[in-house]
């Protein structure tokens, strides 16, 4: 079954990506809701498909379904995180641009163990929490989603429905770049190409005795 929550959509078709000879699947609206669904026959494995969307104003748009991708955080990562032994958690949580199956996008992850729902909202989806609801990975408290088409420079926040029923927007605690105050949005950034120039300082730090030096 393919399901997609698409507010303001008039029609949706699931289009096979890697097997163009297969027929497209028209998704039907469920009642009066914004949910569309359709059945893929004889598909028991991971299935790559685009959503061809016709919006209410007649505009057409085609994109990969965010939920057609596997989680970008492994079970081992979650195991180490829950034990408190994940030493590079900043590489897992936050926002990280990447390419998956030839699709450019950004993987988002945040720890919100008491949340009822978490969505990533930003200028790429009209700040509408209905477009990119995230999925909780097991009982870890980590919510994750890969958002196709969201790239470097996109502004975003996490929209969280708390256990008390309050809907709040939060800045990413693992964000790499931010708007200038008083604005508070995080900005998707790629720091993999940053050239560090502190080799001399690192070497001197390793050679020095910290107990014999001033604290600052």
What would you call each of these model-derived segments?
Residues 5-11, 111-118:
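Short proline/glycine-enriched turn/loop motifs at strand-loop junctions of beta-rich domains
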Residues 10-14, 22-27:
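Active-site-flanking structural segment that lines cofactor/substrate pockets
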Residues 12-14, 118-120, 156:
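Short beta-strand elements bearing conserved aromatic residues within extracellular beta-rich modules
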Residues 21-22, 126-131:
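Short beta-strand and strand-turn-strand segments in soluble, beta-rich domains
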Residues 119-128, 208-216:
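Aromatic-rich, solvent-exposed beta-strand/loop patch
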């Amino acid at each position: 079954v393919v399901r997609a929550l698409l507010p303001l959509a008039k029609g949706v078709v699931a289009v096979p990506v890697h097997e163009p000879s297969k027929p497209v699947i028209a998704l039907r609206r469920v009642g009066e809701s914004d949910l569309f669904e359709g059945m893929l026959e004889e598909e028991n494995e991971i299935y790559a498909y685009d959503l061809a969307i016709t919006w209410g104003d007649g505009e057409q748009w085609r994109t990969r379904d965010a939920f057609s991708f596997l989680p970008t955080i492994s079970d081992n990562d979650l195991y180490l995180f829950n034990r408190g032994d994940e030493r590079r958690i900043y590489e897992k949580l936050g926002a990280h641009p990447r390419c998956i199956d030839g699709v450019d996008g950004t993987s988002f992850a945040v720890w919100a163990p008491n949340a009822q729902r978490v969505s990533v909202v930003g200028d790429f989806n009209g700040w509408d929490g209905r477009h990119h609801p995230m999925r909780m990975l097991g009982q870890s408290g980590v919510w994750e989603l890969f958002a196709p088409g969201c790239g470097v420079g996109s502004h975003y926040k996490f929209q969280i429905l708390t256990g008390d029923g309050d809907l709040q927007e939060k800045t990413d605690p693992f964000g790499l770049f931010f708007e200038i105050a008083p604005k508070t949005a995080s900005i998707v950034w790629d720091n993999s190409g940053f050239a560090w120039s502190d080799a001399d300082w690192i070497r001197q730090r390793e050679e020095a005795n910290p107990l014999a030096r001033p604290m600052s």
